[in-house]
Regions:
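Alpha/beta-hydrolase fold nucleophile elbow
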Residues: 138-150
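Conserved alpha/beta-hydrolase "acid-adjacent" motif
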Residues: 260-266
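Hydrolase active-site cap/lid region
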Residues: 158-220
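N-terminal cap/lid segment of alpha/beta-hydrolase-fold proteins
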Residues: 3-66
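Histidine-bearing beta->alpha loop at or near hydrolase active sites
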Residues: 283-293
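Short substrate-entry loop that stabilizes the transition state in hydrolases
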Residues: 65-66, 77-117
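Short beta-strand/loop motif that positions the catalytic acidic residue
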Residues: 247, 253-255, 259
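Alpha/beta-hydrolase active-site loop
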Residues: 118-138
Length: 309
């Protein structure tokens, strides 16, 4: 196990006057994924070590002994990352209300230096290693609360689905929920797979999906997304032809009705699919709000998570 290069930095976030302390550290995880269908009688698994940078913020109420501080995993979206050199703390940046409410908050760069890993298996493996490091080296709760905005919401949902034993609750802020397109009534909700336009010299989201999910011949391959496509994970089609999604824990979602990046129709359908399963979900739709985190979202997220500590 690789755990090294821990450093502590102090700087301000979000234009705040106050400075905060951040702990940066690195974990090593296995990047290998067996995506072939070979029948050869041989050991196929192997170790491909990669290093992932992580950021942890502790609240003023944190103590090294006594009651454990509740831990939140706050995953960043596709436009952010974690990098000590750049004072980039990923999803921790948007969780200051949680830190001020007594929660520790953790995020990871992702499975590649660019951080745009979009909830693929390696991203979750790296996040789990970071979680284990945090709870082993600090007085933090082993059961966690998980949040994320936009693509970070996609990562958060995937993490909860794959590690249900340690997740108490999900708080999703305008989450990306479908890799492939979904038709709801007469409305088509585009997936990340559909976003083929490249921006600012970068490859398109479509091409990023091909890369990180390792699609063969650059063609759609549903088998490579199983377990990592939130709307289709832990789900089935009911007798009425509607999808039923069974989340591993209670869920609350915040979604702006003027969002042009995440389709509010898709988010509503996701909430309804959870209700069809008889599971608990809350959905707060915000009129006049686009693809941005508002003070209302921050305050309610803290109140939502306080129910579970």
């Amino acid at each position: 196990m690789y755990e090294a290069n821990e450093k502590r930095l102090r700087f301000s976030l979000n234009g705040e006057e106050r400075e905060r302390d951040f702990i940066f550290f690195e974990v090593r995880y296995n990047h290998f994924r067996d995506v072939s269908e070979s029948v050869a009688h041989e050991v196929r698994d192997r170790y491909e070590g990669r290093v992932c940078e992580c950021a942890l913020a502790l609240p003023d109420t944190y103590r090294e002994t006594g009651a454990k501080t509740p831990l939140v995993l706050s995953f960043h979206g596709a436009g952010n990352t974690v990098c000590a050199e750049r004072h980039a703390v990923g999803g921790v940046k948007y969780a200051t209300s949680l830190i001020d409410s007594g929660f520790a908050v953790l995020d990871v760069c992702g499975s590649e230096p660019h951080g745009l890993t979009m909830g693929c298996p390696e991203h979750l493996f790296a996040a789990f290693k970071a979680y284990r490091y945090a709870v082993r080296h600090y007085n933090l709760s082993e059961q966690v609360l998980v949040t994320g905005a936009s693509m970070g919401g996609h990562v958060a949902m995937n993490f909860a689905n794959n590690f249900p034993a340690i997740v108490l609750s999900l708080g999703l802020i305008y989450p990306r929920l479908n890799i492939d397109g979904v038709t709801v009534g007469d409305h088509y909700c585009i997936g990340t797979w559909d976003k083929t336009t490249a921006k600012e010299g970068k490859i398109s989201t479509h091409d990023r999906i091909v890369e990180i999910y390792r699609f063969p011949e650059n063609e759609w391959c549903e088998a490579r997304t199983v377990g990592f496509n939130p709307y289709r994970s832990r789900s089935f089609i009911g007798a009425d032809g509607k999808r039923v999604v069974i989340p591993p824990c209670p869920v609350k979602i915040w979604q702006g009705l003027e969002d042009k990046t995440v389709d509010p129709v898709m988010v509503r359908e996701f909430a309804e699919s959870i209700r069809r399963a008889g599971c608990y979900v809350e959905l707060h739709l915000l009129d006049g709000v686009g693809h941005t985190i508002t003070p209302v979202m921050r305050e309610e997220l803290a109140m939502w998570f306080e129910r579970f500590v």
